[in-house]
Amino acid sequence: MKISAAVLTVVLMAASLCAPASASPNGSDTIPCCFAYLSAVLPRAHVKEYFYTSSKCSNFAVVFVTRRNRQVCANPKKKWVQEYINYLELK
């Protein structure tokens, strides 16, 4: 039973790092909106730039763009997100 609980935990953690935290266009509009935040800290070396979601989106978020051009949503209230923004601004 402990093994299946551990496997389930790993699967759920992996799933939380996937698509729900990605920025997606809102309908036919090309403005990305976020519906969930990344639950883990993104390695800073992977981040090349960032932008904020539009006020038209229901959730305010920071969208980090990775070196592979993947857009990842992050909670702007998290300390690590604010530190990454400061780092990118000073870069």
From Swiss-Prot:
Pfam families: IL8. SUPFAM superfamilies: Interleukin 8-like chemokines (SSF54117). Its main location: secreted. Disulfide bonds join 33-57, 34-73. It is found in: Secreted. Keywords: Chemotaxis, Cytokine, Disulfide bond, Inflammatory response, Secreted, Signal. Residues 1-23 form the signal peptide. GO terms for biological process: antimicrobial humoral immune response mediated by antimicrobial peptide; chemokine-mediated signaling pathway; eosinophil chemotaxis; G protein-coupled receptor signaling pathway; inflammatory response; positive regulation of cell migration; regulation of insulin secretion. The keyword Disulfide bond applies. GO terms for cellular component: extracellular space. The keyword Secreted applies. One of its GO terms (molecular function) is CCR chemokine receptor binding. InterPro entries: Chemokine_b/g/d (IPR039809), Chemokine_CC_CS (IPR000827), Chemokine_IL8-like_dom (IPR001811), Interleukin_8-like_sf (IPR036048). Belongs to the intercrine beta (chemokine CC) family. PANTHER family: C-C MOTIF CHEMOKINE 5, SMALL INDUCIBLE CYTOKINE A. Chemoattractant for blood monocytes, memory T-helper cells and eosinophils. Causes the release of histamine from basophils and activates eosinophils. May activate several chemokine receptors including CCR1, CCR3, CCR4 and CCR5. May also be an agonist of the G protein-coupled receptor GPR75. Together with GPR75, may play a role in neuron survival through activation of a downstream signaling pathway involving the PI3, Akt and MAP kinases. By activating GPR75 may also play a role in insulin secretion by islet cells. This is C-C motif chemokine 5. It comes from Sigmodon hispidus. The gene is CCL5.
